Structures are given as C-alpha cells and as structure tokens.
Amino acid sequence: TIPLLIAALDPLQENPINSERRAVALNAIRALGILQATNAEEKLRILLKKNDYSIREESARSLGMIQAQAAIQDLCELLSGGQDKVEQIQPGSAKLKEPYESVLEALGAIGVASHSVIIMITPFTKHSRPLIRASACRALLQLTGDQKWATPLIELLKHDDPLIRRGVLLDLGATGWMPALPAIQAAAIENSLKLVALRGLAEKSEDTSVLDAMDAL
C-alpha cells in the first residue's frame, strides 16, 4: 500500500498538474501521515517547497504525524519572514501566505524542543488569528510542558466563534495536558468533539478520570 501511495505523489511534479491526480495525491499525502510512513519523509519534505498551499499544508501535517525530525528545518523555514510576512494573505483569498496552523502543529508533534524551534514558534502566540495563536500554544505546551501555554488555550475555549472553540478543544486534547480536563468538560461544544479531545488526553495519560469523563458524556 505505501509504495502505491508514494507513487501517487509523482504527478505533483508535473506542470501543469492534472486536477484529478492532484486530488488523489492530496489523499495519498494524508494517508501516508496516518500510516506513519517514514519512507515517505523525503518526498513529503520536497512537497513543502511546492507553490500549492494545500500540498504544503497536508505535507506538513503528515510529517508531524510521522514525527519526521529531518523535516524540522524545512518546517521552520515556512515560519520565517518576520511579523509582516506571517500576517500577509494571498491575493483574492482569506488564506495566509503559509499554512501556519499545520506547520506549528507538526513541530509540536515531532517533539524536538530545541532552542531554535521554540524561538521560531513563540512569536505566533501573538498572531492576529486565534487558531494560529492556539496552534502555537499547543506546540509550545507539547514541547515544554509549561502550563503558561495552556492558559491562552483555556481562554480561547470561551471565544464567541464556535469554530474557534472547536479547534481549540481539539488542540487541548492533542497536547495530552491533563489539567485541561475540567475545561474540556465544561466547554460549550458538542459532546462528539469532546469525546475526540478526551480520547487525546486518554492516549497520553493513565489517569482513569478521563475515562470517567468520557463515560459521563
């Protein structure tokens, strides 16, 4: 299966890229991450340099799932450029220049808490977009274990926008930070997503109170 998925990435090197093959390739990128296909790391790192935003976004996410330490420098390069650049949007779109959420989440998932990585992530905790701030805090909480990065996430769980509340809930679950349990339980979010977040806590903790919380929903 994995060799076939890797082969499905080849059309992304064509110019122009066939739209149907592009869609297949994007699904292959996602699948390689889910399967934690370490032998796909090199190809996924190359795809981080493509002009296609969605390809960079999904490649970053999958490299995080694979925990590809060799990709750290490539991911950090996507975060570089200073405050002006990271706030810029693409012409005719609401999307930013880079898929910062998936890049930040990938660095947190890879788990290398080097000084250079921390320095690169930290400015994004002040980004104008709440979900990017959340992704940065999520990554820093994963990398450092410092609860000061959990505080902004807890606060964002009270945001007026339900989409932001949902995203932040999943971020808290992904960190495995057990003190977030009461906030997850109390959040104004549907129980189906609370279960996903609680499952994230349960996967990283042996505390049975998480299982009790899941049963109570």
Task: Kindly label every feature range from the protein language model.
Residues 10, 33, 64, 108, ...:
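Structural signature of alpha-helical solenoid repeat scaffolds
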Residues 82, 91-98, 199-205:
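Extended, low-complexity, acidic/polar intrinsically disordered regions
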Residues 17, 21, 51-52, 82-84, ...:
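Short inter-helical turns and helix N-cap capping residues of alpha-solenoid HEAT/ARM repeat scaffolds
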Residues 2, 21, 25, 56, ...:
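Residue-level detector of extended alpha-helical repeat arrays and alpha-solenoid scaffolds
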Residues 22-29, 60, 100-107, 134-137:
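Boundary/linker elements of alpha-helical solenoid repeat scaffolds
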Residues 119, 130, 134-138:
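Alpha-helical adaptor scaffolds
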Residues 1-15, 37-49, 68-90, 113-125, ...:
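Amphipathic alpha-helical scaffolding segments comprising HEAT/armadillo-like alpha-solenoid repeats
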